């Protein structure tokens, strides 16, 4: 067969595959085991019959951008919606990386970071977590100084260790590096949320959203983007929806790589409904955190080393 041109960075890239598991209890994707809250399920069933499936969705998902922006007290242009937050991760590697550039990623962490870096044509440079799975800010800052990456990715809480890195650590890194920073906060809803900026005067429902998150630093720094997802705490993994929040400058550049009508209308409707009813999920999240801690204590009694998790999973050694 004739040899066709294929980008160099793709020639040795394999298809990413995930094993299909036929089981009653499935844990390998960190999904929620909870269905939609009953009142939201009833509302969904009523709207589905007459939903305007024949119409395109909002071009840039403006309907969802606006409600998130209102909560975060930012311009709606500072928000971008995507097919899961991993979609924005890929776009960020494409926009801020590319041939001849380096992207700094944590190890051990989410396997897809390396995939996205490779697809963008960038070179990965790894920074190691400490023995307990936490980020050492000085190590990351030094790596950025030496390697000069065009993008730095931080996973907080980290997957697969579950470690939550304090706002002080995150802010030290953000304020010290010269490249854009991606904060992947897919599991932040499960973190303790024990840290709040001391002078934050937002109402309680808005404080809960940003507790422990780099979202609370928006407006103070312009070099980072926070990614969040509806797949984990909110149980919409099957609909694929996430969002990014950052400075107007970074988000406008990121938006250039996003196609029009990129998130389907029903996903946007459901994500907006869930977002506007976040309070319904607090009890579930609390239960998951409590059961996680019980299981961690039990595993420690059995002699396992359990990484200190602030996510909805545990890593044992």
Summary of predicted features, one role per range:
Residues 28, 246, 315-317:
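Conserved PLP-binding active-site segment of the aspartate aminotransferase-like
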Residues 95-154:
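PLP-dependent aminotransferase-like
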Residues 37, 223-300, 304-307:
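PLP-dependent aminotransferase class I/II
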Residues 126-128, 150-157, 182-185, 308-310:
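Short beta-strands and strand-loop turn motifs
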Residues 1-55, 148:
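N-terminal "arm"/small-domain region of PLP-dependent enzymes with the aminotransferase-like
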């Amino acid at each position: 067969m004739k040899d066709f041109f294929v980008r160099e960075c793709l020639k040795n890239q394999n298809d990413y595959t995930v094993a299909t598991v036929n089981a009653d209890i499935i844990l390998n994707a960190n999904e929620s085991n909870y269905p939609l809250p009953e009142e939201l399920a009833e509302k969904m069933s009523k709207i589905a019959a007459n939903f305007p499936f024949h119409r395109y969705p909002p071009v840039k998902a403006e309907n969802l951008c606006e409600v998130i922006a209102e909560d975060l007290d930012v311009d709606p242009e500072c928000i971008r919606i995507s097919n899961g937050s991993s979609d924005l991760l890929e776009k960020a590697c494409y926009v801020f990386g590319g041939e001849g550039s380096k992207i700094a990623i944590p190890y051990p962490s989410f396997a897809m970071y390396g995939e996205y870096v490779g697809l963008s044509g960038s070179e990965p440079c790894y920074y190691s977590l400490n023995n307990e799975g936490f980020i050492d800010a000085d190590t990351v800052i030094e790596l950025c100084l030496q390697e000069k990456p065009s993008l730095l990715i931080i996973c907080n809480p980290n997957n697969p260790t579950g470690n939550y890195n304090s706002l002080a650590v995150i802010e030290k890194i953000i304020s010290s590096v010269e490249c854009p920073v991606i904060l992947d906060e897919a599991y932040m809803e499960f973190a303790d949320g024990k840290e709040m900026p001391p002078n934050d005067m937002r109402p309680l429902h808005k404080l809960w959203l940003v507790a422990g998150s780099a979202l609370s630093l928006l407006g103070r720094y312009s070099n980072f983007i926070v990614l969040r997802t509806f797949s984990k705490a909110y149980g919409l993994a099957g609909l694929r929806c996430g969002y990014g929040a950052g400075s107007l400058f970074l988000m406008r550049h990121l938006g250039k790589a996003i196609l029009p009508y990129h998130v389907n209308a029903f996903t946007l409707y459901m994500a907006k409904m869930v977002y506007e009813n976040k309070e319904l999920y607090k009890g579930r999240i609390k239960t998951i955190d409590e059961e996680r801690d019980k299981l961690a204590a039990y595993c420690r009694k059995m002699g396992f080393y359990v990484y200190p998790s602030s996510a909805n999973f545990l890593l044992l050694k």
